[in-house]
Amino acid sequence: MAGCSDGDRDLPRGYRHLEVPQAVLSSPAARTRGRALFLEHCALCHGERGDGHGQRSEGLTRPPRDFTSVDWRRSTSPRHVFFAIREGLLGTPMPQWKSLSEQDAWNLTAYVLSLAEHE
């Protein structure tokens, strides 16, 4: 799946055609590792459930993304989530996590995308 979907056109060139590891996205082991990373790096802002209600969320200039939202899940792509993890989001409190390996960034992506599956 090397081509870019229409929803990925707004990503920087290096991310538009990024190979999405579908096996990782559907892997229970990847999601388990992603959950551990989420609790370590993301839960303070996004909340342990990923609903955007973390301990630090109230003091932020913009509310954290609610990853449990089915509407959000339908409007995003794995490349967008991976990009946000690696590069942060300009104009928001979302920091870069370039210190994560590419594999762990995909593991975290897999977990984040799974949060809206049970809504």
Model-predicted segments: where are they?
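Sec-dependent bacterial lipoprotein signal peptides
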Residues: 1-3
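Axial heme c-ligation environment in periplasmic c-type cytochrome domains
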Residues: 5-6, 65, 84-115
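Sequence/structural segment immediately N-terminal to covalent heme-attachment motifs in c-type
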Residues: 27-51, 79-82
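Inter-heme linker and motif-flanking segments adjacent to c-type heme-binding CXXCH motifs
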Residues: 51, 114-119
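Short cysteine/histidine-rich zinc-coordinating motifs and their immediately flanking basic loops
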Residues: 55-59
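Short Fe-S-cluster ligation motifs
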Residues: 73-86
